[in-house]
Amino acid sequence: MRVGLISDLHIDINKDYPIVELTAEVAAEQRTDVLVIAGDISETQAQTLQAIDKLQSLCEFPVYYVPGNHDMWNKNCPECTTEEIDCIYREDLRCLSGKQVILGKDGRQLALVG
């Protein structure tokens, strides 16, 4: 099983670059079976979740993520606690925080644990 692993997309800071599209393109070129993003997608939950939605729509393989420190902040809601923000992410099935996913290919299994 080919696992693609990337982190620190920072789509808000890098808004002038097609990072989501390029990530999907490179992962497909590498014949990725599953893509894992190891944090720091954006500094707002809405942008992070939109990016994951878009990335999944461009990929023919599952996309999972674990929020990083930047994903756990919210510039638009300074009074939001990390516990509240974490609850938002944990509702998303693609978020690995506190979860595990078992994937299989060719009779072999891989556990992704967040």
Model-identified regions with their sequence ranges:
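N-terminal active-site segment of His-dependent metallophosphoesterases
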Residues: M1-Y64, M72-K75
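Conserved catalytic scaffold of divalent metal-dependent phosphoesterases
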Residues: L9-I11, D71, T82-G114
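Amphipathic alpha-helical segments in well-structured domains
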Residues: I52, T81-T82
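Hydrophobic/aromatic beta-strand patches that form the interior of the parallel beta-sheet core
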Residues: V36, Y64-V66, L96, V113
